[in-house]
């Protein structure tokens, strides 16, 4: 069992802005792209997670859980858990989003909404993850037009 899986049993995730996979891969997630991070990272510590919503995905293959860091309520957390072994496939932490508290499945995508209007969008298990923040929206740079 990985360190991430062991810590998740106590609802703890790495204190790292971005997506951390159970195999050790790390990604930065942005509005229009995600990129692998190759340099050594200083993760800091671990965050305790208060789960605010959860939703089963794809007929019982996965469970997506979202919430906030108990230490600081403005930090949003999303975890994709395998229902085969109840271990995290990946964890996502954002100190720009506020807590994530709603999950919507639409058109094959998972949309996780935060209390500030931020949206984490992904296809499970990990396809094209994007983080849309309300103040950096492509619509805001386009005068609010769609």
Residue ranges of predicted features:
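Short loop/turn segments that connect beta-strands within the blades of beta-propeller domains
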Residues: 59, 74, 106, 115-116, ...
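Sequence-structural signature of mature extracellular/luminal beta-sheet repeat domains
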Residues: 34-36, 47-50, 70
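Conserved beta-strand element within WD40/beta-propeller blades
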Residues: 65, 112-113
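A short beta-strand motif characteristic of beta-propeller blades
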Residues: 38-46, 86-94, 128-133
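Structural motif
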Residues: 71-79, 118-121
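Repeated scaffold domains used in trafficking and secretory/extracellular systems
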Residues: 2-22, 44-61, 65-66, 93-107, ...
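Alpha-helical oligomerization segments
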Residues: 115-146
